[in-house]
Amino acid sequence: MAKRGAFSSFHSFLIVLLFLNSVLAVTHGHQDKQVYIVYMGSLPSRADYTPMSHHMNILQEVARESSIEGRLVRSYKRSFNGFVARLTESERERVADMEGVVSVFPNKKLKLQTSASWDFMGLKEGKGTKRNPSVESDTIIGVFDGGIWPESESFSDKGFGPPPKKWKGICAGGKNFTCNNKLIGARHYSPGDARDSTGHGTHTASIAAGNAVANTSFFGIGNGTVRGAVPASRIAVYRVCAGECRDDAILSAFDDAISDGVDIITISIGDINVYPFEKDPIAIGAFHAMSKGILTVNAAGNTGPDTASITSLAPWLLTVAASTANREFVSKVVLGDGKTLVGKSVNGFDLKGKKFPLVYGKSAALSLSQAKCAEDCTPECLDASLVKGKILVCNRFLPYVAYTKRAVAAIFEDGSDWAQINGLPVSGLQKDDFESVLSYFKSEKSPEAAVLKSESIFYQTAPKILSFSSRGPNIIVADILKPDITAPGLEILAANSLRASPFYDTAYVKYSVESGTSMSCPHAAGVAAYVKTFHPQWSPSMIKSAIMTTAWSMNASQSGYASTEFAYGAGHVDPIAATNPGLVYEITKTDYFAFLCGMNYNKTTVKLISGEAVTCSEKISPRNLNYPSMSAKLSGSNISFIVTFNRTVTNVGTPNSTYKSKVVLNHGSKLNVKVSPSVLSMKSMNEKQSFTVTVSASELHSELPSSANLIWSDGTHNVRSPIVVYTGDFSQPSSS
């Protein structure tokens, strides 16, 4: 999710946040009609079944009207069964009780949640990186987002042959929208076209699969080659967001993309609220994608660092948190006395080091009674005549204030760990440095300063989890660890739409900088596609396992739950290692059915979701789903406990290999962990062997999870799985 209207609650970040807004309503008689999604599971296998006719018959039956014109909004008929309709509350209740209907839920509205990052992860340009060009060219990434700018050089088809034969999609991008042999498909689900008006969709698509484009920068900042993980792959774009991202549009995109023939789906969209799987459009669509061999990669969200803020919770999703790479952008402030301070900003304005007078917001108040609010640069409290031509100093910063008050630049206190783009030169300083500016301002008769153009700095402490990245634990399935993985989401330079100005004016740029889990999500999706180019027959769960078990381990950068596995899952994605994991944890569709039964879904609901006769005679507790990580929530603290995890691994490394287990306790952990058997001898490829992990302790810390890592090693491969045991009651943070 990026920030700037998509998993983004921040000024210039786009992340696709799923906001629950009011649903569409049409007045009819004494009851309002609202738009509802009627989900009916998989399509029946009968040759004579016509989905739309069935959907119309249902509407006629419940509406009890001679005409139902305008009632049916859309039908899902390609990859799963369902429809969207305008219903009264009583009609909704009747539909929900009908045979064959899994769930009926309101059509919510969403908003969107953004290269050095690939070099940082070892996926470098040129001959040093192993590639499988022919398979990569046959790989199709489906991008569910706000559209795309098709003319971007990142999506040029120079050197590309025709689309893969498996492609069954179309180019329905609208008027003056042209696809090519790189951008092979486009659809949109609202009036208009598939063009991107915010820059978010263009940005995410180029991160995952954009061409290598040399000499790109944001006004000279971050100059280099921008590229995706799999630049030879194809892109199909599904514009599900046009202002908001509606549930019905997302389900339509899944319905189309599955039938179109995509290999990976990246969706930097999410909700700020948690819903059960049968009412979550991303979970529903991704389940059907998984059953057809397609992995869905989803942004974790940008509502951190609160615990239990993550909403991408289904185990068949690869849920991606956001972390730093080894590059960030800074904007220095040089005070009149020569002192230099380093702040955060993506500042493309070059004032050539010229110093301008400083004015503190409080000193520019319209009146004495407004001095307090002027400290925060509240617009209605500032006298524009006292601000014009000066550098405005604010306790906090509202991006448009300094611009509208005609300041030449701005300095403000900013404790965040990410930089924003603004419409004039700014620098956000940490508290101590900001206090230095105030002290200098008060001590000088004519205080002045210069705000310098941003520059890149590189450092060795990456990766670190970012504060805005949504955290676990999982409040739907407490024994499934979320997020799964983390990837770069800080200040990512990628392609931009020429309909979208980073300054919210007419200054359009071809490449821009964004931050958020919207940016980390396509990084992970690109890695998934990269892995698939070497293992085209691997299932979604095998690809997911390879990414998770080869991840770089992460260390705590903060205290509390916000800096544990609930922040970063298995660790930071490692593209090269993920192509050769040694062992994988595979989860079949049947396993997921047993998992849903173990969650007390009744067999009728599971059957309707799966389209198969499911008796629920087999149930898997979430703790024993063959997941690459292991997590258990216990009741109470300071108790003795024993928990077990049953797992099965498949050999994808080499035949005649012996894996020995090793357990590494994390700092402060008092867990006792036993693995049985402790040695796995694999004679052949694709051989499966099972083991049990038993975890015990005499007490648990009530404020922190206890964790360890299980590592299976044959001397070449190190297959690592986090083990997390925790207590405490968690609820989703308030969205207010």
UniProtKB/Swiss-Prot annotation:
| Compartments (UniProt record) | Secreted
Which PROSITE patterns does this entry report, sorted A to Z? SUBTILASE, SUBTILASE_SER
Grouped into one coarse class, the protein's main location is secreted
Q: What Pfam families is this protein classified in?
A: fn3_6, Inhibitor_I9, Peptidase_S8
Per the record, the domain of life is: Eukaryota
Keyword vocabulary terms for this entry:
Autocatalytic cleavage, Glycoprotein, Hydrolase, Protease, Secreted, Serine protease, Signal, Zymogen
Q: Where is the Inhibitor I9 domain?
A: 35-112
Residue ranges occupied by any Peptidase S8 domain in the UniProt entry: 117-579
Question: Where does the record locate the signal sequence feature?
Answer: 1-25
Propeptide positions in the record are 26-113
SUPFAM superfamilies in the record: Subtilisin-like (SSF52743)
The record's listing under PANTHER family reads: PROPROTEIN CONVERTASE SUBTILISIN/KEXIN
| Name of the protein in its database record | Subtilisin-like protease SBT4.11
Protein species of origin: Arabidopsis thaliana
